[in-house]
Design a protein with these regions (language model features):
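N-terminal export and membrane-targeting signals
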Residues: 2-23, 47, 362
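C-terminal region of N-terminal signal peptides and the immediate post-cleavage residues
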Residues: 27-45
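Short, solvent-exposed loop/turn and secondary-structure capping segments
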Residues: 43-44, 60-66, 126-129, 175-180, ...
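Catalytic nucleophile-elbow at a beta strand-turn-alpha helix junction centered on a G-D-S/GDSL motif
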Residues: 48-65, 74-76, 171-173, 371
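Solvent-exposed loop/turn segments at secondary-structure junctions
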Residues: 56-60, 119-125, 170-175, 248-252, ...
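Conserved SGNH/GDSL esterase-like catalytic core that processes O-acyl groups on lipids
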Residues: 73-210
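A structural motif corresponding to the C-terminal end of an alpha-helix
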Residues: 105-114, 215-242, 278-310
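Mobile gating loops/cap/lid regions near enzyme active sites that modulate substrate access
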Residues: 249-368
Length: 413
């Protein structure tokens, strides 16, 4: 006969089991809450984000420098040698040469986070040149490289993207090569027999009706890729806004230069070696052609959630070599932090030839909006974000000094 086994559980043991059961339930609930919280970041939910796409005029190229000088580069070094290091530890670039600076317009603050996916040198389509990958506004995916539209799609799935500012098209028109030709013509032809880049076939073919039509279609396709990326990520058109911006004038008209076109002072001192005639043509024909193509492409995309931001005159009064501003040494300054520096110095980086390149400067920074200009554009984007109800308009300087966020005063209207 087997002994009877007592299967009853005493009070202390019951309390232990109840405690274990309660802990199990609590952990299960926490896991569920954690899962819910993780899923809360995405289309229409969570912290709002601004994600910028495009080329050097939005990535933050030249953002390291605040003004220009022919003295020590330390006078204008606002961000230091880590200016373009955009990995998590700020020790290297995620894509070499993209130059995504910390002063870029993506980071508007005020409870809105920013992500900068733009890349200097980018065109509408991805490509590799001299072993450097340049992601376009497409879904390229090969060899570990991705297009910006694909990057956006992946990012937007797990973040609440509310505004997508875009700057694209300038490189499609080979504007950097155009500028190079203009500077070479200034340096290598005499004032009494000048070669004008604006009269060279290799330059003007970029602005021909046929090429304008081709590039306008490419820009439209890039914009539609952005909309497709957001749709693929689970967004409706009412949950985000695309903000297409055009390009600013970086130089004044010929009569607005503070250096004569006679001799070499204009380039050797000012870093703005263009003939008056070419400067006039750049502002009257070349840049308006690009800007019109960008905005017409935006219109043809027929997206109900698209706004435009006109920055063509955003830097007027602070442009490279423009009268009314100067190099730091010309304005009696020895630091970009000096009193009134933002009002007295240029917002466009000098054009540096190889022979004039020294210190930490890089050629790809030439003729780009610098630290002050990028903070100004950030102010413009903040106003375009409009506390979550995005709007478009034209952005221009509204006064001297800085706002509470340390940005130049600008008005979007």
């Amino acid at each position: 006969m087997y002994a009877q086994t007592n299967l009853s559980i005493g009070r202390p043991a019951r309390l232990v089991l109840l405690a274990v059961a309660a802990l199990t339930v609590a952990l299960t609930l926490l896991a569920a809450v954690g899962t819910h919280a993780a899923r809360a970041e995405g289309p229409g939910e969570g912290t709002p984000w601004v994600v910028t796409l495009g080329d050097s005029y939005i990535s933050g190229e030249a953002g390291r420098w605040a003004g220009n000088t022919n003295e020590s580069s330390s006078w204008i070094d606002a961000l230091g040698e880590k200016a373009y290091d955009d990995n998590a530890g700020h020790t290297a670039e995620l894509i070499p040469g993209c130059h995504r600076s910390q002063s870029a317009e993506a980071y508007i603050g005020g409870g809105v986070d920013g992500e900068n996916l733009a890349c200097s040198g980018a065109e509408t389509s991805s490509f590799t040149e001299e072993e450097k990958f340049k992601p376009g506004l497409d879904f390229y995916n090969s060899g570990g490289h991705e297009g910006q539209a694909l990057m956006l799609e992946k990012f937007a799935k797990t973040h609440n993207v509310k505004l997508v500012p875009i700057s694209i098209g300038g490189n499609n028109f080979k504007f950097a090569e155009v500028v190079q030709t203009c500077v070479e013509d200034f340096l290598f032809s005499p004032e009494w027999w000048p070669d004008y880049c604006s009269e060279e076939e290799s330059v003007m073919e970029n602005f021909s009706a046929g090429n304008v039509s081709t590039q306008q279609a490419a820009i439209k396709g890039a914009i539609l890729n952005v909309a497709k990326a957001m749709s693929n990520a689970g967004y409706t058109s009412t949950q985000y806004t695309i903000l297409v911006q055009n390009y600013p004038s970086p130089i004044p008209n010929g009569e607005g230069f503070r250096y004569s076109q006679k001799g070499y002072t204009r380039q050797e001192v000012g870093g703005c070696g263009l003939w008056n005639h070419d400067a006039n043509e750049a502002n009257a024909t070349m840049l308006p052609t690009i800007d019109n193509a960008v905005f017409k492409a935006a219109e043809e995309a027929k997206l109900t959630n698209l706004k435009t931001m006109n920055i063509s005159s955003a830097f007027n009064g602070r442009r490279l070599c423009e009268k009314g501003v100067g190099l730091l040494e010309e304005e009696g300054l020895t630091s970009w932090k000096g009193t009134g520096a933002v009002n007295k110095t240029e917002w466009i980086n000098q054009i540096r030839t190889v022979s004039a390149l020294f210190g930490s400067y890089e050629l790809q920074e030439d003729l780009h909006p610098n630290y002050w200009a990028q903070l100004a554009l950030r102010n413009c984007v903040t106003q375009a974000y409009n506390s979550g109800t995005p709007k478009g308009g034209a952005c221009t300087i509204s006064g001297e000094g800085l706002n509470a966020a340390g940005e130049p005063n600008m008005t979007l209207k």
